[in-house]
Amino acid sequence: VNAYSRITHASVHLPTGRQSACEIEQRLRRHSPSLALPPGLIQRAFGLRERALADPADLPSDLAARAATRLLNTARLRPADIDLLLFAAVSADVREPANAHIVAAKTGLSCPAFDIGNACNGVINALQVADALIRTGQHRRVLITCGETLSRLSRWELDRSRLRTGLTSLTGADVGAALLVEASPVPGITGSVFLANSTSWPAATLYDPHHAPGQPQGLHVDSDALLASFTGLDAQAAQWLKEQDVDVRELDLVCVHQPSQPFVDAFRARMDIDPAQIIPTFPHTGNAAAATLPLQLAQAVHDRRLAPGDAVALFGLASGASGAVMLLRW
């Protein structure tokens, strides 16, 4: 019996559409003429050069299904070879049924399927679930899918009072991603820790218009409050790594959530991570939400940055606030 799990494949679907930081600012000026927006603000504030945009007709499930289909083709697997499909994303086609069923139908899968949601930590929590289900013998192959269309949460009509919580919405990206987790005779997912600071949940909100109609609608992110919500989580993560006898500087690859370049730089400095250990995805893709971590893994595979036996760490950070660290042996 294979008592462990490992990530065996990572795939991504990046739409060809792009919107530059300059184009974002031009559109914002058209819709919010009262703002005296200084040129270059988006790039200076976030480090964004351009973001990925899906075709208007594409839904989150379409992006997820394309990444999943690509993964199955690369792995030379049939739909019948998958035991369980998980969908984990901020974005969604529907509230009912689970979006995983839509992705399964589009990829020809007939296995059980369900959604996992934890803001931008959805995929790393899906890895947690897949690892547990495989270790307990309930499944052998779990396909994790993600489809993000965060560009559609852009708030174009802003005034000075709403600029602080609305500007971040203009950095969201459209990305599809997929990971395959399989039973293994040797450890692949070697350890993980999950953390939370739930009293800070108001820092970033996207209220449901049907069930919370009296609340502010649209994506609202107080960047300062969100950054403060992670205070203490980084220290707990560092302490856990110390207990695992892991020196971050000795890792071959570090994947970290990338909501902005300044955020990545600040997190890297606090965790003593070398810039060369991180693949920067934000500047030319944007904030890919839950697809950010699999995007970096897929990019590392594409660039041949990963070899069998390499030590990898995934750092998840999400509104809520929640934090996670997962250690992998590739």
Pin down the residues of each PLM region.
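Claisen-condensing/thiolase-fold acyl-transfer catalytic domains that form or cleave C-C bonds
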Residues: 61, 65, 91-92, 102-105, ...
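Acidic-glycine-rich active-site phosphate/pyrophosphate-binding loop
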Residues: 35-44, 94-108, 146-158, 208-211, ...
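Condensing-enzyme catalytic core mediating Claisen C-C bond formation in acyl metabolism
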Residues: 1-56, 158-227, 329-330
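Flexible, glycine-rich active-site loops centered on histidine and acidic residues
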Residues: 135-173
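Phosphate/pyrophosphate-binding loops at sites that engage ATP/ADP/AMP, CoA/4′-phosphopantetheine
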Residues: 67-83, 235-252, 300, 304-305
